[in-house]
Structure formats: C-alpha cells, structure tokens
Design a protein with these regions (language model features):
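Loop-to-transmembrane alpha-helix entry segments
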Residues: 19-22, 38-58, 65-72, 176-199
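Helix-helix packing/entry segments at the starts of transmembrane helices
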Residues: 18-24, 89-107, 141-176
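C-terminal-most transmembrane helix of multi-pass membrane proteins
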Residues: 61, 164-217
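Hydrophobic/small/kink-forming positions within alpha-helical transmembrane segments
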Residues: 1-4, 26-31, 57, 80-83, ...
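Membrane-interface helix-cap regions at the ends of transmembrane helices
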Residues: 1-4, 52-67, 107-129, 175-182, ...
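Transmembrane alpha-helical segments that form core, pore/gating elements
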Residues: 29-30, 64-120, 133, 146, ...
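Hydrophobic/aromatic residues within transmembrane alpha-helices
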Residues: 9, 35-37, 41, 92, ...
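Specific transmembrane alpha-helical segments of multi-pass solute transporters/efflux pumps
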Residues: 1-17, 22, 56-58, 134, ...
C-alpha cells in the first residue's frame, strides 16, 4: 500500500511534495513504536527529529504553489504505510526479511496488473522504459532489503530518521537533466534540505560517540 500510494502521489504532484510527505515518517514511526513496541525515544533522537522538522516546514512553505490535494493525500498515506512497515519489522524480528519484501513486491505486481487491465493499457513498453523499469525495480528491492536488515539492530524511530536521506537524494535526482525531468528545487527546498542533512549528521555523530543505541533507555 505504501509503495502504490507513493507512485500515485508522485504522479499527481511534484517530487518535492511527495518526498516532504515521506519526511514525516519519523514522527509517525516514533508514535507507533511508542504505542505498540514500547520503545522510548531518547532526547538526542528527538533533537534530530526537531531539526528535521524545521527543514520540512521550510521546504513546505517553498512548494505550496505546486501542491496537489490528491498527491498530498497519497503522500501522507505512503508515509504512514512505510512507518507501519518499519514498526512491524521491529515487532517480529524473527520474520524472514527477504520473504516480506518478496511478498510486498508480488502484491504491487498484482495491483499494477489489475490497474493496467482495467484501464485497457498495454503491458509492453519501449526498450528504454523497460530498462528504466528494471533499474527501478532492482534499486528499490535492494534498498528495501538493506532497510529490512538494518531494522534488526536499529530502533524504528531511528530507522526512519536515517531514511530522510531519501528526501535529499530524491529532490537532487529529479533535478539532474540526465533523466529528462529537470525539476529545479526552490531556494526553500535547498535550505530545508540542509536542515535535514544537519539532523542526519547530528544523529550519526551521536551514534558514533555512543557505543550502545541511545534510543533504547
């Protein structure tokens, strides 16, 4: 559901708005982890989330003119979905991670096939698009597998905090003229991205200075 909502969101609004919605994952995850896993969040992690919040607000004010209600709703749905995914990974650590990702991919395939069939669209694409689809599927699958492996050692809130690198990287990639998108980020997006980067660096330094995971009190 999270992946499907992400696709619908990014096709109905700008990449910046979609990624801003995903940047809210640490907040949803922290709340869900506290309610269902009883994971207490340390002060340092809350500081990182607060710094990231500043960046998100700055980026949001700079992208309001591009906002789409449908895209925003799907973006929030995707954010909540990925938060639930992160919490469930922590909830059942013994669950085979590769199996979880494989089942999720199969579910996405079935839904996509149904949508294509209902809209009477072709299952075939050009060689260029097919290559892009393959590259996309490989990278997303690899990312989810690594994300799942990391969930064994890192608390849920911290796991999604690290995933904020996707917000910075995503906005950068759609800006590159190489891919033909050339979606130029606004000044607010750049400044907000800097705050997100600072929050991640702060968290990384704290984790390096402390041998144990400080989020688990």
């Amino acid at each position: 559901i999270a992946m499907i909502s992400f696709i619908y969101s990014i096709t109905n609004t700008s990449a910046a708005i979609t990624l801003l919605c995903l940047a809210a994952m640490p907040f949803f995850t922290a709340l869900l982890a506290f309610l269902f896993l009883k994971e207490r969040i340390s002060t340092n992690v809350w500081v990182s989330i607060f710094i990231a919040t500043i960046g998100i607000v700055i980026m949001a004010f700079g992208n309001t003119e591009k906002n789409s209600v449908i895209g925003f709703i799907f973006g929030i749905t995707s954010s909540i979905g990925f938060s639930v995914f992160s919490v469930t990974l922590r909830w059942r650590k013994e669950t085979p991670k590769f199996t979880t990702v494989a089942i999720a991919g199969l579910f996405c395939f079935i839904v996509a096939a149904l949508v294509i069939s209902i809209n009477k669209q072709s299952f075939f694409a050009t060689s260029y698009n097919s290559a892009m689809f393959s590259l996309h599927g490989t990278l997303v699958c690899l990312g989810l597998i690594l994300y799942s492996i990391g969930s064994k050692a890192i608390p849920a809130a911290e796991l999604t905090l690290l995933s904020l690198t996707e917000v910075i990287g995503g906005i950068f990639w759609v800006w590159l003229p190489l891919f033909g998108i050339n979606e130029i980020p606004s000044t607010n997006t750049i400044v907000g991205g800097f705050f997100l980067f600072v929050s991640i660096v702060y968290y990384s330094l704290i984790m390096r200075w402390n041998k144990r995971y400080i989020a688990l009190n």
